[in-house]
Amino acid sequence: MRLKDKVILVTASTRGIGLAIVRKCAQEGAVVYMAARDMERAQEVANTLDGVKCVYNDATKPETFSSMVADVVKDAGHIDVLVNNFGTSNPGKDLDFANTGPQIFLDSVNLNLRSVFMASQAAAKHMACHGGGSIINISSVGGHVPDISQVAYGTSKAAINYLTKLIAVQEARHRIRCNAVLPGMTATEAVEKHLSDDFRNLFLRHIPLGRMGLPEEIAEAVCYFASDASAYTTGQILTVSGGFGLATPVYGDLVNKAVRR
């Protein structure tokens, strides 16, 4: 098992990608701590998995980041890996640059970016005194390939990519690695809820592999960065998107239409 006896803290982990990460890490032998605001839901999940425990964290309350890390250290003695899975978007409100309100922008920055900064800072202070560790940020392909909408979400995720590299450089002296995983369109409950058939078909046209990703596939990438197999890897931005963003199919379509004329 790749992660045997590693202590791994996963934030925002009761559903979707976060839950898939918890399950995969547990399967690989890790002792996993689910950080969540809904402790009842977290405990229900933990009860179904071996080696999984719960700690409280509310991303809207800055004081809970240091207490979250302290709770894990008190129980396990140390933290080997932090997985920052914070992320929120505001469909229908997070629009283009000209039409997104300042509060929507600040909400995304606070939850998506500030949370990663504060959780990473709290964990790194501990890791620096205990031989190092690995910080893994779940960003988004939306922070790598600019969109025509979701200016707040995309900007916050792009900043996480920068922060990942900065942490990697500045904390290397403490043997702390930091990498990011950028999921593309992933088949979670939240995505399926807001995805119309028309939009699904349109989006799939722009994914070379022709399908949405699975939460378990994102979890596999996380396990790599959490494992000793990536001991010499830091500051990397790994896109797991089925090839989305590699090409410009819209441009190709326009060229073909022009030629046909």
Kindly give the residue locations of the regions a language model identified:
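Active-site helix of classical SDR
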Residues: 120, 156-159, 164
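Substrate-binding pocket helix/loop in short-chain dehydrogenase/reductase
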Residues: 93-97, 101-106, 203
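Short, small/polar-rich loop/turn modules that mediate ligand/substrate recognition or access, typified
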Residues: 172, 177, 233-235
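Residue(s) in the substrate-gating loop at a strand-loop-helix junction
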Residues: 140
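Alpha-helical segment proximal to the catalytic Tyr-Lys
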Residues: 125, 169-170, 231
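Short C-terminal tail/terminal secondary-structure segment
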Residues: 234-261
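Conserved glycine-rich cofactor-binding loop
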Residues: 12-15
